[in-house]
Amino acid sequence: QTLSNGIEVVAAQTGDVPIATMTVLVPGGASTDSREKAGVAQFAAQLADQGTADMSAQEIAARLESLGASLSANAGRDGTFFSLTAPVANFEAAGEVLSGIVRSAQYPQAELDRERKRAIDGLLVEMKDPGELAGKVASLVMYGDAPYGSQSGGTSESLAAITREDLIEHRQTWWHPSETKIIVSGGIAPAQATGLAQSLFGDWTVGAPAPTPPADPAGDAQPVRTVVIDMPEAGQAAVYAAVRAIPRDDERYYALELANAVLGGGSSGRLFEEIRTKRSLSYGAYSGFADRADDAVLAASAQTKNETADEVAQIFLDEFARLGTEPLDEALLDRRRLYLGGSYARRLESSSGFNSIVAGLMQQGLEPAEAARYADRLGQVTPRQAGAAAQELVDPDKATIVIVGHAAEFIDDLRAIRPDVEVIPAEGLDLSSADFGLEG
């Protein structure tokens, strides 16, 4: 159902326990951040409950607590989610708090300064953690200067530059009723849920037209690179191998989902089997790709001793090749379908899980009903289709490798695999551009 101001509402009764969840999905994810102000979308979401036109942060917290309600907010790449869970009897009262937050978050300076310090302190820790840093570098290398390549959590420099006015401007620009979607589920009748959405958000209007999201947030596919971030003090190395993948609405999505489950889904994936079970090179090795409105990245990752980083990178490349060349058999795919379908079904059982799945689908341009088709879609994928998706997309020759660790312990062996290695010091690393600030 669509409200008069353009808000799309999806309501489903997913249980009998009288607790419900309302998720409000607005545009303006991290892909709308400029590099100079990376982190604006995340700050705008996280700090939205720190004061509105009518309530202080303390009043908001006390009100939600008195109603038995919990509120979370997060900015993904493609949009921002607010999720409110409360007893049905208190749902309207809690929803009034949420409505005030979405419409009129004020971002008090003191709260911004406190969150900024906490976030910058956290980033300093992450920049010394090989696993955290490798993930940031891989994202930047895979997307270059395209919107998806922006650091969603910001950099120390960008967080220092964010002002209160930036956050208010972000809210006023991107949180727009005509582009907003509301999902309500749990122990609440759909008619009651839709009525609540109408009473809470139906009169929300904004004078300015709806903003236009970035047209091509993933940008062009980037050159294949082998990047080593040298961290001499690292006790171990983090290894990533990443390839360009597909948007959520691509017809090959379910084939790639199944192929990836064979490769690196959980402890029965091939990467775990080869790297952990057979060779004890790591405590775990996995692969995955996010659901995105534009091209995602499929990445394999593991942490290992510095001296075996090159060996893990080679296993990643070998397993990428094997996935696309060695035929997949139906029995193997059946086991993977069971694994994927089971975890998906468990997520759908809770109102928060249901809402997050449906909100994601809507954000990625698919209809909410797709949530109920997941197991069927996986069941329709043939071994040949899964193999073809792997061959086309999970190609070792197209894989960018990122290793963060003590380079001296693996660099010579890595050059035997990939001669064209870029070695960049971790100290003072600039994550605002794909050349790490080294050019120009």
Feature roles, as predicted:
Residues 2-3:
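A general beta-strand register signal
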Residues 10-12, 16-49, 55-104, 116-124, ...:
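M16 family metallopeptidases and their MPP-like homologs
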Residues 106-107, 111-112, 162-164:
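Peptidyl-prolyl cis-trans isomerase
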